[in-house]
Amino acid sequence: MTDLKASEGDLSDYYMRLKKIFSNETRLQSREASISKRSSRVHKNILSAKEAIERQERDFGKLQKVLLNRNQELERRFTLGEALAQQLEVTRQRNADMEAQLLRHTTEGRQRSNELMECMHSLKQATGTYINHEAFPARLNGVSVVRADDGDIKLIPFSLDGNDADGLHTLWRSLHTRTDNASKWRKLISDQEVAGASPVTPSGSERPKATSKHSNFMPTSIIEIDLTSPTNDAS
């Protein structure tokens, strides 16, 4: 009887052990399933993260390429800007030089014009001859004031071809040999000699030709009185 009870106790204990083992195994399987699910999710997340990283790397490569192109474009524009700035500075300097040169030429031209106007005024006073400078250089037009022996004043108009050397010399001799303006002529020539000029006055007996060396003296000077500025002295 005692042995039977002992045997029943052993079976009960054995049953409890088996039950505990099955329970532990079930619990382990449940844990394994849970771990497997978690592992699957982690693995899936890792794959997603890897794909996202690859996409970002591709996007970064594209952005890096765009950035490189932009940097190259900026360098080209910067180089172009420097070249344009240098060219602009050269142009400004050239314009400044041209303005200075133009101002100098304008000043010299104005001074020369004033000198010519003074010369023309002196010639008018010395010769009593008034020239229309607007007809130069094609023609020599004007009027000469001549005092006759009886004291009367006559106005003698003239119109000569600018290339007519004989006519210009004839006009020169006519003006130069006028007795009423001889003192003015002497004063004008004296002033020119003092200033370093070398005027040539052909004599009344000379008959200069168109090819004569005298053809470049006073007639040429008359034509060169220019005749770019208006005459301030009315005839």
Swiss-Prot record:
Keywords: Cell cycle, Cell division, Centromere, Chromosome, Coiled coil, Kinetochore, Meiosis, Mitosis, Nucleus. It is found in: Nucleus; Chromosome, Centromere, Kinetochore. Residues 193-216 are annotated as: Disordered. Residues 44-106 form a coiled coil. One of its GO terms (cellular component) is nucleus. The keyword Cell division applies. One of its GO terms (biological process) is meiotic spindle organization. Belongs to the SPC25 family. Acts as a component of the essential kinetochore-associated Ndc80 complex, which is required for chromosome segregation and spindle checkpoint activity during meiosis and mitosis. Required for kinetochore integrity and the organization of stable microtubule binding sites in the outer plate of the kinetochore. Participates in SAC signaling that responds specifically to disruptions in spindle microtubule dynamics. The NDC80 complex synergistically enhances the affinity of the SKA1 complex for microtubules and may allow the NDC80 complex to track depolymerizing microtubules. Component of the Ndc80 complex, which is composed of Ndc80, Nuf2 and Spc25. This is Kinetochore protein Spc25. The lineage of its organism: Eukaryota, Metazoa, Ecdysozoa, Arthropoda, Hexapoda.
